[in-house]
Amino acid sequence: MAVLEICTYPNPILKKKAVPITEIDDSVLQLVEDMIETMYQAPGIGLAANQVGKPLRLIVYDITPKDQPRNPSVLINPEIISCEGSQSQEEGCLSVPEYYAEVKRHARVTVRGLDSRGEPVEICGEGLLAVVLQHELDHLEGVLMLDRISALKRALYKKRRQKQLKSNDGLVSSPS
């Protein structure tokens, strides 16, 4: 297993729609293992394949409390088949560093996909699980949490992020 590099905003791959996986072969299974390790190392509770530079319809997640054994889940080619209600919850994203915002989402969702053995699965989630599933499936559609907040908050984050990137690349000197 390997820890993969997480793509961060404004990497263009994050805005690309992921393609379905047509065959669950050894390379897909290795990607699943690497994504799980990367998610835990980050640390995070969900990760979509395009966040690690692979535009494939694949997500991993684990919302198990920290004081309990890990229990990662995998969904290949997931799709939301039903949703209802609404909720707002503060979210963060491994691809949107150092930023948290209230995001409005459905309160309950049902998602259908395949597990890592290629078996059909259906997940019904509410609360945090519903948020994680919607957040990760958004990634597969090229949608970031930034796209779900107000234009003002988005503009402020983009400005701050550009400043961070310039500073990190040595293009802007730090004040002495």
Regions found by a protein language model. Give the residues of each.
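Active-site rim/adjacent substrate-binding subdomains
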Residues: 1-134, 139-176
